[in-house]
UniProtKB/Swiss-Prot annotation:
Protein name according to UniProt: Lysine-specific demethylase 8
Matching Pfam families: ARM_KDM8_N, Cupin_8
Any single GO CC term annotated in Swiss-Prot or TrEMBL for this entry: nucleus
Coiled coil regions, renumbered to chain: none
Annotated function: Histone demethylase required for G2/M phase cell cycle progression. Specifically demethylates dimethylated 'Lys-36' (H3K36me2) of histone H3, an epigenetic repressive mark, thereby acting as a transcription activator. May play a role in the regulation of the circadian clock.
Organism: Salmo salar
PROSITE patterns: JMJC (PS51184)
């Protein structure tokens, strides 16, 4: 316990006076007083430390869940992160049992997911310390939630479409920046790029597998979509550790439902995985900076579906594990694709692409499209606003790069 607390305290400012607590007038003085008490207790080790941290968490949680997420002031997200910081420190000082360490990691993850970066992203530093503590206590086999190799994996019984050659997305091997810009980016034409990610550590140094993902990220808490597609009425979201997600939705346990770790910035949360990938060179043709590129993870079993939709940026979809069937439609044919009228889903089609209701949506069958089965090691360029439908054919891990 002393060793863990020593590592945690070493990540903190040396003195209380150096510990920053700078908030605007939006944060009530009474709340700032609780923060200051937590800071004092952090350095003296006395008082109702953990209870005060929970007060901050409860107060800021209400602020985070008032109105729409985009309108939440950054001050409240920072406040939530401070609450997580103080709670983690209290947990690690009082107790260092395996359950407590896991609770501390979950608290850090909630701060990383819901809060804002504070003090040079100190919560990420805490996670590294806590993960090292777990790895010291357990061998990889003990840490792999019973060991995936000993379990029966969910069998993916999904249909594999036959891609018609006339409708196939064109393919090109390692085009130059100039030729990609001239032939595909400028005219906004989809294309599959081959041979541009073969050098990724995710393929070479430590190929991504269930076991590897559990080793580097098994104890991390992530958002999971539950349901076959986000337009379904029974669709929902929940928070699970990666180990729990794999146990519940990758390994046979509840074959009646699908879980999908979808459109999540996992690589900001787990830097070890970010080290396994590289931003495609072609992103330099955009107008934004590298920091403006949004990198998302898409991990789930066969049968997961992203309904026909469009994105507001250029997209490189890199396939690392498994295969995906993808169909693309030009934005010029938007009217034939019957977008939802609701503002929340205006970028999503009402049509079930592979089993369309031709009575309700008669024009859909007249819309031309391209299609492909994206294989591991391939990258699909999806031009901005191009409609695309995606279905996993088996256990799959994809990485998307949104850029302008």
């Amino acid at each position: 316990m002393a060793e863990l607390w020593s590592a945690i305290s070493a990540a903190l400012p040396v003195t209380e006076a150096e510990f920053p607590l700078d908030f605007s007038e939006k944060v009530e003085p009474s709340v700032v007083d609780v923060l200051k008490r937590c800071r004092q207790q952090l350095y003296t080790g006395s008082g109702r430390w953990r209870q005060n941290a929970q007060i901050i968490l409860d107060f800021s949680w209400e602020k985070l869940n008032t109105g729409t997420w985009r309108d939440v002031d950054k001050e409240w997200r920072c406040l939530y992160s401070y609450g997580c910081l103080f709670k983690v420190a209290a947990l690690c000082r009082d107790d260092a049992s395996p359950a407590t360490v896991q609770e501390a990691i979950r608290t850090c993850d909630l701060g990383l997911l819901m809060g804002a970066a504070i003090m040079d992203n100190i919560l990420q530093t805490f996670v590294k310390i806590l993960q090292n503590e777990i790895r010291k206590r357990h061998s990889n086999e003990e840490n792999l939630s019973e060991g995936v190799s000993a379990k029966k994996m969910k069998v993916d019984c999904v249909s594999v479409p036959v891609v018609k050659q006339a409708l196939a997305v064109p393919r090109i091997h390692c085009p130059s920046l100039e030729s990609f810009k001239k032939d595909y980016l400028d005219p906004q034409k989809p294309v599959i790029l081959e041979g541009i990610i073969d050098h990724w550590p995710a393929f070479k140094n430590h190929p991504w597998s269930i076991e590897y993902l559990q080793t580097v990220a098994g104890c991390r808490t992530v958002p999971v979509e539950v349901g076959s597609r986000y337009t379904d009425e029974e669709w929902s979201q929940t928070l699970l550790t990666v180990n729990e997600f794999i146990d519940r939705y990758i390994v046979v346990k509840d074959a009646s439902s699908l879980g999908y770790l979808a459109q999540h910035q996992l690589f900001d949360q787990v830097p070890e995985l970010k080290d396994d990938i590289r931003i495609p060179d072609y992103c330099c043709l955009g107008e934004g900076e590298e920091d403006d590129i949004t990198i998302n993870a898409w991990f789930g079993p066969g049968g997961t579906v992203s309904p026909l939709h469009q994105d507001p940026q250029q997209n490189f979809l890199a396939q690392v594990v498994g295969r995906k069937y993808i169909r693309l439609y030009s934005p010029e044919d938007t009217e034939k694709l019957y977008p939802h009228q609701l503002q929340l889903l205006h970028n999503t089609s009402q049509v079930e692409v592979e089993s369309p209701d031709v009575v309700r949506f008669p024009e859909f069958v007249k819309a031309p499209y391209l299609e492909c089965v994206l294989q591991p090691g391939e990258v699909l360029f999806i031009p901005v606003k191009h409609w695309h439908y995606v279905r996993s054919l088996e256990l799959s891990f994809s990485v998307s790069f949104w850029w302008s």
